[in-house]
């Protein structure tokens, strides 16, 4: 799958929103009962580009057209969220996939990953090896010594750049020409969760 353009860089601040879906029932007594409907968050990303050259806006425009607006998904790597020292941040309990009893190689939801811990149904798994940049879109991969059993939930903790399967939030994209050969635009992305 294609990867969102790494250049031009968006301006700061940019926004990443994590959303869960919780069903809350309130009783006559005021007591509440909550039920989690989404095990993992659905994320959205808002990017601003305040000063773009004609070639930079064309890069974004061409990518948007190739994705047919909101129709086709793509990979987005969050290479912009860093710690105070400028290093990639830690991510906890990120979805990798589900075992099928035969697959041993899975893409990690990140690249340039380190400090990785794999989990099968919440229990850490030591029998794994990692490969850097060999997955779809340049993601890192994990190989299990033996295939996770059918239905096993595979998650990971890691430090690195988070990879998200996204789509454009809207079927329209505007570009504002605010000076000779200078443009600005904003882009909103929504995570496309697996079925």
Language-model features: where?
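Intrinsically disordered/low-complexity terminal segments and short unstructured peptides
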Residues: 6, 17, 21, 25, ...
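Residue-level detector of short, conserved catalytic/binding motifs and their immediate flanks
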Residues: 45, 116, 152
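Extended beta-strand solenoid/passenger and fiber regions
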Residues: 61-132, 148, 158-195
């Amino acid at each position: 799958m294609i990867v969102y353009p790494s250049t031009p860089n968006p301006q700061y601040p940019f926004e990443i929103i994590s959303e869960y879906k919780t069903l809350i029932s309130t009783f006559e007594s005021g007591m509440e009962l909550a039920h989690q409907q989404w095990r993992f968050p659905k994320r959205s990303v808002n990017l601003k580009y305040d000063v773009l050259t004609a070639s930079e806006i064309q890069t974004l425009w061409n990518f948007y057209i190739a994705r047919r607006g909101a129709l086709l998904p793509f990979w987005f790597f969050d290479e912009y969220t860093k710690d105070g020292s400028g290093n990639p941040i830690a991510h906890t309990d990120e979805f990798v996939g589900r075992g099928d009893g035969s697959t041993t190689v899975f893409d990690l939801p990140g690249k340039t990953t380190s400090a990785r811990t794999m989990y099968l149904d919440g229990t850490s798994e030591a029998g794994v090896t990692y490969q850097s940049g060999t997955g779809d879109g340049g993601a890192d991969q994990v190989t299990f010594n033996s295939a996770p059993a059918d239905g096993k939930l595979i998650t990971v903790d890691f430090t690195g750049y988070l990879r998200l399967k996204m789509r454009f939030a809207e079927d329209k994209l505007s570009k504002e020409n605010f000076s000779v050969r200078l443009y600005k635009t904003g882009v909103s992305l929504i995570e496309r969760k697996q079925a």
